[in-house]
From Swiss-Prot:
The gene is cotD. This is Spore coat protein D. GO terms for biological process: sporulation resulting in formation of a cellular spore. Keywords: Sporulation.
């Protein structure tokens, strides 16, 4: 018996099936938020005005001289 080799057809190529392999890395990104506090020390001056008052007394005296007649002797 004679065996024939099977006929070979051209291969059928299917679309490529894509697979994904994920790797992850960690990167730290520093975010700096500066802050500043200013202490404002207010000083308030209250000017209090005093008006001391003094009293004084004045006793003026007046003098009147009268001639009660004529001297008896002339000097």
């Amino acid at each position: 018996m004679h065996h024939c080799r099977p006929h070979m057809m051209a291969p059928i190529v299917h679309p490529t099936h894509c697979c994904e392999h994920h790797t992850f890395s960690k990167t730290i990104v520093p975010h700096i938020h500066p802050q500043h506090t200013t202490n404002v020390n207010h000083q308030h001056f209250q000017h209090v005005h005093y008006f001391p008052h003094t009293f004084s007394n004045v006793d003026p005296a007046t003098h009147q001289h009268f001639q009660a007649g004529k001297p008896c002797c002339d000097y």
